[in-house]
């Protein structure tokens, strides 16, 4: 249903514009090409220049314009440019057409056959030309050949050329899908990653077209040149996986400790060395086919339109079949081998003739084809990489999906689910930490009956809501975008040495797990939830930024019950203060109150939850008496026990995790921009900003910088005056200060600053026990 909706949306919003854009090239060719023998050269040149412009547009749109202007203004700019092109075309149409240039071949004197007829430019001229030719043929003796068909290749050859035209579009777009998936295994997968691959492919196609324009000037047989191009492209494709493995050290993540620009240059260099040879050579095939069309051409526009149509249909089918069938069924390397095989078969089918040169060319194609089929084994190439620092990690099972590669790995820390080699969705070794993402909001709001989880991952967090300790929970709905993640979780997380880590998520009648885009589900459903719990999302990954936008927060707010709350988990070890402040500012803009809660107190690995509250909400009161448990937890302890403290966790002591009221301290975030669908600041700025720090001083908002931010918030709005805590006792309101002191003690302890650690410990004990 989701796919059908997307196809419908694309068809209605993009098809009309793309249909009209498809007319440009044939019409321009009809205007510019006045000589039959110049058709291949000029049309290839036009195609190359047009594609070079596309590469420039992709670079600007992929790297700069959305951040500078926003999507809407970028679209307006594109419309203005299109109108400018239309105006220029209209002005050109007012000028007289250039005079027809006759064929460059030396004409036979006074013979009708030797003259190359002028190329018609209008429908009336074409019809007149056809009537004249028909009249000439009727007057010509039967044994005299026609001027148009005398040098034409046989019909079978024409069909092979059209098939190669189709394959050119099919192969290049299918390969672009494969190349993108290939690099998703070793790159951070931000919007810039995909823009880089697209720009490199477009530049190579443009250069290939310009090379083709030069080849069209040669006197060599076009079919022989085509065969050699296809053969060279297939050879480059065969080498691509091995070059990729060499440059990425067997698929390890490509990273740089330098600046943003140095990292982008590293990506461009790695991607160009890997795919540019294949893309450049294969990019010459389609424009060079225009050279072979010269013998058949009656009208430049008609021929260009025919070739472009066949090539584009192939491109559409290549992207669709590769994305939805080949990757799922064959995987990256086998799919690349099949596409290489198709190119080699096409080269063998081209009608070269039976002279020695042609036979040698065919023999070489056959040898390369056999080597590709039998000597090279794609199964020997790795599909994902493991953590080089965890040498004991081993891969248990892999699923190659259309949009990512999902793997289950096992190591000393437990069983993990990963996406694209390096992005971990969770592990049995982090069971308690993941479960806390459900426990914490349910301890704050113990009367919760219904929850929605945006993201499933291992299933531990969503399943945590079904724990018997949360006796009021009646409904849990969880959405996961990647179906293979659900498969992995069902298979490996429900029976971990006999223990169901998901808490019965896949068989409890209260739970529903959907393979669906969580954001789209919240926009479309009419269901209401007491808690909408959004998982951790890496902010710089492509698509993740949309889960931090104002529009998403607004649609989530609409799905809350009158007393419901929205919970957004944030990995501070992947956020700079800039990104955190943008997200905080955006949530403050949507929700009446926004509070911040710690997930843990481990310096360097901090996670927080931002909870969006609706108007008039306060935290519910708690009548649990935890006094004895609190005293027992610290009895006889000192700063050396910081890492071993077992503090009680219940609805009373949960305020220990409270970081403060962000709405009351909104002055700290007012200078930061909003993150919106139109201006996706997080998605485009996060990959840049975190590379501004040096290698020995990470820019993440963890440790002391985060503790300092909490101190600022609690200074502006002390817990004793916090409107969200009015239902809590005076002593209980001191718990947030105890949490801040405890976190500070952990930070100073890691620095081995004994005096500062002791001071923070003393402050923690005072606030924890509510004694002065």
Model region roles, listed by residue range:
Residues 515, 771-772:
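Short, solvent-exposed mixed-charge patches
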Residues 763-767, 771:
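Alpha-helical solenoid scaffolds that mediate protein-protein interactions
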């Amino acid at each position: 249903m989701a796919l059908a909706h997307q196809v419908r949306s694309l068809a209605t919003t993009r098809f009309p514009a793309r249909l009209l854009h498809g007319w440009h090239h044939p019409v321009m060719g009809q205007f510019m090409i006045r000589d039959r023998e110049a058709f291949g050269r000029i049309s290839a040149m036009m195609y190359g220049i047009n594609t070079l412009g596309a590469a420039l547009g992709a670079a600007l749109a992929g790297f700069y314009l959305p951040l500078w202007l926003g999507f809407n203004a970028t679209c307006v700019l594109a419309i203005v440019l299109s109108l400018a092109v239309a105006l220029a075309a209209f002005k050109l149409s007012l000028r007289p057409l250039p005079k027809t240039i006759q064929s460059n071949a030396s004409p036979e004197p006074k013979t009708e056959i030797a003259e190359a007829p002028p190329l018609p430019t209008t429908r009336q001229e074409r019809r007149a030309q056809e009537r004249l030719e028909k009249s000439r043929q009727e007057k010509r003796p039967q044994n005299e050949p026609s001027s148009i068909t005398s040098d034409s290749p046989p019909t079978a050859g024409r069909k092979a050329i059209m098939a190669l035209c189709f394959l050119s579009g099919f192969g290049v777009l299918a390969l672009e899908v494969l190349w993108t998936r290939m690099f998703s295994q070793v790159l951070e997968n931000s919007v810039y990653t995909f823009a880089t691959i697209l720009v490199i492919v477009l530049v190579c196609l443009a250069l290939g077209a310009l090379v083709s324009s030069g080849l069209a000037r040669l006197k060599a047989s076009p079919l022989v040149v085509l065969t050699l191009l296809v053969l060279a492209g297939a050879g480059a494709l065969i080498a691509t996986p091995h070059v990729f493995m060499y440059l990425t050290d067997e698929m390890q993540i490509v990273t740089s400790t330098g600046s943003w620009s140095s990292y982008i240059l590293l990506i461009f260099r790695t991607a160009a060395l890997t795919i540019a040879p294949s893309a450049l050579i294969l990019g010459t095939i389609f424009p060079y086919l225009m050279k072979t069309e010269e013998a058949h051409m009656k009208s430049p526009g008609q021929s260009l339109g025919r070739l472009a149509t066949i090539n584009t249909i192939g491109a559409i089918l290549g992207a669709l079949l590769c994305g939805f069938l080949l990757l799922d069924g064959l995987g990256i390397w086998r799919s690349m081998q099949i596409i290489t095989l198709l190119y080699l078969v096409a080269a063998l089918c081209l009608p070269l003739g039976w002279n020695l040169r042609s036979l040698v060319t065919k023999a070489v194609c056959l040898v390369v084809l056999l080597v590709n089929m039998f000597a090279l084994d794609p199964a020997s190439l790795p599909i994902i990489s493991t953590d080089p620092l965890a040498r004991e990690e081993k891969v248990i099972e892999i699923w190659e999906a259309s949009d990512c590669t999902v793997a289950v790995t096992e190591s000393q820390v437990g069983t993990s689910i990963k996406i694209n080699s390096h992005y971990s969705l969770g592990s049995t070794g982090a069971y308690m930490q993941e479960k806390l993402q459900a426990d914490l909001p349910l301890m704050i709001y113990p009367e919760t009956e219904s929850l929605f989880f945006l993201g499933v991952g291992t299933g531990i967090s969503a399943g945590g809501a079904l724990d018997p300790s949360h006796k009021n929970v009646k409904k849990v709905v969880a959405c996961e975008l990647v179906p293979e993640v659900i498969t992995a979780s069902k298979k490996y997380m429900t029976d971990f040495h006999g223990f169901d880590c998901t808490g019965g998520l896949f068989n409890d009648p209260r739970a529903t797990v959907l393979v669906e885009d969580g954001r789209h589900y919240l926009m479309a459903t009419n269901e209401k939830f007491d808690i909408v719990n959004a998982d951790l999302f890496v902010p710089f990954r492509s698509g993740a930024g949309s889960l931090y936008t104002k529009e998403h927060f607004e649609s989530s707010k609409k799905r809350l019950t009158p007393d419901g709350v929205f919970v957004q988990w944030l990995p501070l070890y992947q956020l700079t203060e800039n990104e955190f402040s943008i997200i905080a500012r955006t949530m403050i803009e949507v929700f009446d109150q926004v509070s911040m809660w710690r997930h843990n107190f481990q310096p360097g690995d901090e996670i927080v939850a931002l909870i969006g509250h609706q108007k008039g909400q306060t935290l519910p009161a708690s009548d649990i008496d935890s006094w004895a448990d609190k005293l027992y937890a610290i009895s006889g302890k000192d700063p050396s026990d910081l890492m071993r403290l077992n503090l009680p966790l219940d609805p009373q002591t949960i305020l220990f995790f409270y970081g403060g009221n962000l709405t009351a301290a909104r002055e700290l975030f007012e200078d930061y921009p909003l993150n919106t669908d139109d201006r996706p600041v997080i998605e485009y700025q996060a990959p840049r900003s975190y590379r501004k720090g040096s290698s020995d001083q990470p820019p993440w908002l963890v440790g002391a910088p985060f503790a300092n931010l909490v101190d600022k918030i609690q200074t502006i709005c002390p817990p004793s005056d916090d409107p969200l805590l009015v239902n809590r006792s005076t002593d209980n309101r001191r718990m947030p200060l105890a949490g801040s002191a405890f976190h500070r003690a952990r930070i100073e302890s890691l620095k081995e600053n004994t005096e500062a650690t002791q001071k923070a410990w003393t402050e923690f004990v005072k606030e924890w026990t509510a004694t002065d």
